[in-house]
Amino acid sequence: MVIKVVGGIIKKENRYLIGRRGPKEKMAGFWEFPGGKLEENESKKECIKRELKEELDIVVVVGELISEYQYSYSDISYHLYFYRIDDFIGEPIPIVHDRLIWAKSNDFKKYNFLPGDNPLIDLMLNNKV
């Protein structure tokens, strides 16, 4: 079974919003781009709007799909979709994360990201997205 997950790439002043998974979350302590699982009968853009409202309490304008790939862990596979967030209303607050930061892409290697985010990070660091 493959689980579909949609993530949002939120950029402000050359920094990207990343969150550290809270202690009650699966894979707690790992950093990630905010997002979540696609629900039945939901479009990918509807999903990222819902997830960012639930996780960060912001309303977003969803831009283009910037990356899509499949990533498998030993016990589960994910199909990941990452959308650029063109604009947002509100100030992001950590609801499911225990910490949010605005990080420069050249600092990404300092953070312990979810392994599934690493293909996207590699693209970002090589200016491919």
What are these regions (language model features)?
Residues 10-11, 18, 87, 102:
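Conserved hydrophobic "DFG−1" position in protein kinase catalytic cores
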Residues 59, 69-91, 101:
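Active-site-adjacent beta-strand/loop module that shapes the phosphate/pyrophosphate-binding cleft
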Residues 1-16, 37:
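Conserved N-terminal beta-strand and adjoining loop/helix that marks the start
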Residues 55-62:
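Short secondary-structure junctions
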Residues 84, 93-124:
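NUDIX/MutT-family hydrolases
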Residues 15-54:
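Conserved Nudix-box catalytic region and its N-terminal flanking loop in Nudix hydrolases
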